[in-house]
Each structure stands twice: as C-alpha cells, then as structure tokens.
Amino acid sequence: KTEIEIINRVVDNINDSIGFSMNIFVKTLYWSKNVMPEAGEYPQSIINKQILDKSDAIIAIFGNRIGSPTQHYESGTIEEIELMIQKGKQVFVYFSDKPVRKSEIDMEAETKIQAFKEKYKDRGIYVVYASDEEFNDYVSMHLTRYLTTELANEVNRVNEHTRFDDSISQRKEVDLIYDYTKFYDIKQVSSYTDSNIMKIR
C-alpha cells in the first residue's frame, strides 16, 4: 500500500531530522497491529477507545471507497474524522486522484466520495493529490508545519506560567492517526469492518 509506505517514510525522516532537534517523536499506530481484541463492544468503539482517544492528530486517505458503515456514521474513517474535529484535534484528509482501472470504478462509491467532499469543502480540511510524489510532498509539508506549530504553542504555554528551563526540552511524543480507505472494501472481520487504518502516536 504505497500511501502507507510513504507516510512511514515521511515520519521516519521527520523523526531523524526536525524531530531529533526539537525533541519530538512521532509514532505510527496501525489498527491491525496496535489494537487489542476486546469482547462486548462494537469494533469501531474498540478502535476509538484504544487508539483514537489517545491520538493528537489523524491522517485519513480515501481512494475510490468511503469504507464500511459504523453504528453512527457512514464509515469508520468518517467517524474518526468527526470525533477528532469535535475534540479540536488536528485532522488531515487526502483524496487520491491517481488513475484507476475501469474495473475498479464503483459509481455508487464515487457518489459517496463526492458527497463527502462537498460536505467538507468549506471546512478546509482536505487535499486532492494526483501522484505518489505529490502525496509525499503534501504529507511532509503538513506534518512539519503541524509539529513546529505544536512545539511553538507548547513553548508559549510554558512561558506563560513558568520561567523557561530544561523542562521544555523533554522529549514530546506526538500521537498521530491515519486512516486509509483504499481502492477496495475488505471483507468483514471479527475485530473491525473498515478498510486499513493506521494511527500515529
């Protein structure tokens, strides 16, 4: 999955460069690797509790599918976007405009994607990319700006209440989610019904 590989590569580069100099560490979390199975709850509720609630930001990537519905939203990805917005956390949404095979085109899914874009177009939270290179550039630029802004805000908060000392240089871990709804729907599984989701912590 190229976009996931790109995000991992960008995060590694950030951690090795500005992350190292700024004492910030970005950690990626992926639902299939980082969510522990639980009984008695809906799959999306488990995702939200174990990963979403602990994350500082989310990256959501849409191909030509919007994902599988949850109890409350049209897809798990959309639920996570809405919950993060409600909490005032950072949301990055990317739509792939890369070429796809005709056999992969689903007009019903495409209609849902367009409706989603229309709903969010005035909220300024999504970007359309046409190639892997463009996606790489967007993610790198957006994450870098986000992290430098977060650090500046942290410094300002400290300076408002205490004198500046070595405490501000303690390593800060940033939780960042990304949710990936690619060019297909996965089969329903016991732990989760959406496409691929990765969290960054």
Language model region names:
Residues 1-201:
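Conserved catalytic or regulatory cores that recognize and/or transform ribose-phosphate-containing ligands
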